[in-house]
């Protein structure tokens, strides 16, 4: 299920979908079936050890939980930090392995990177989940796995072939 924003109709943010398919997408950004007054805290990418540890301290202090969308290329530098995030009770989700965009926009990264093929993107998504599984796949929090099947695309832009890669890899959101 795609949960997006009103910007999903901008042609440089979405590729390969027909008008009818785009009309069926949830562009409200609202997650259904949650309690009133629920706030979702989500964190993308990866930071320094110091910044992540400070963030974990603040979340612990306020008894708050979040979802961390992880660029797994960075996990190799400190897998124990990812385990600490999971063991603190936060959901772990994928933000790809290399943070390469699914849809190429001229504004992405100043145009310094080349887009990936559909096969390369599928491999990047697969590698991302594999690294997360290897690092935190055994962590359980309150009886449920810390590792989720959530995915957030870099730059939040999507394409039909990218969505196919994500769903084929077993992601649900």
Model-derived features: positions:
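His/Asp/Glu-enriched short active-site or ligand-binding loop at hydrolase and phosphoryl-transfer sites
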Residues: 162-173
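Active-site beta->alpha N-cap acidic-glycine motif
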Residues: 2-116, 127-149
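Surface-exposed acidic loop/strand-edge motifs in secreted or periplasmic proteins
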Residues: 120
């Amino acid at each position: 299920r795609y949960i997006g924003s009103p910007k999903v109709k901008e042609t440089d943010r979405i590729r390969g979908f027909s008008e009818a398919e785009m009309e069926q997408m949830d562009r409200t950004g609202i997650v259904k079936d949650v309690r009133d007054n629920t706030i979702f805290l989500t964190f993308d990418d990866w930071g320094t050890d110091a910044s992540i540890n400070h963030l974990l301290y603040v979340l612990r202090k306020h008894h708050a939980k979040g979802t961390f969308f992880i660029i797994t290329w960075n996990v190799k530098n400190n897998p124990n930090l990812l385990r600490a995030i999971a063991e603190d009770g936060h959901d772990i989700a994928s933000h790809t392995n290399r943070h390469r965009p699914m849809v190429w926009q001229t504004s992405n990264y100043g145009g310094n990177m080349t887009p990936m093929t559909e096969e390369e993107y599928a491999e990047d998504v697969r590698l991302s989940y594999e690294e997360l599984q290897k690092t935190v796949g055994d962590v359980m929090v309150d009886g449920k796995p810390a590792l989720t099947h959530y995915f957030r695309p870099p730059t939040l832009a999507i394409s039909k072939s990218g969505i196919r890669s994500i769903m084929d890899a077993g992601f649900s959101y």
